[in-house]
Amino acid sequence: MLYTEKEKHEIERVKEVFAEHLRQSPDFELLWSDKVGYVWLAIGVNPVYVDTGIRIESAADLCYRCLDDVATDVLYMTGNDHALEEADPLEMAEIKRRWEPYINQLPEYAYICDDLLSGRQ
């Protein structure tokens, strides 16, 4: 068994909360494999390429990756080439604003925001 029933249900709950973000992202795809479970696949659409795949270990793992991607979108938007923990106050405010709808639905994962902002994985 790849995940317990409870683990898979929780991963699917996180997936549903981030469904629109997952659907719209040009940088990754979340796929199901009967062999290994959920796989986070780094991709590109212009040019088209497939890069690395990482197995999603838990709902917290998926939430971390999604929140990190939301924050990365803000950093790309501002054109600044630096790590999340070095975001300026305006970037930080926008990141937190974009995280809010997700964390409101997944409050048990709010600690992940602090982990991301401090550079912890």
Which residue ranges define each predicted feature?
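Negatively charged, low-complexity tracts enriched in Asp/Glu with abundant Ser/Thr
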Residues: 1-29
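Intrinsically disordered, low-complexity regions enriched in serine, threonine, proline
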Residues: 5, 20, 93-95, 117
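Acidic, low-complexity, intrinsically disordered interaction modules
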Residues: 32-106
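Short acidic DE-rich linear segments
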Residues: 119-121
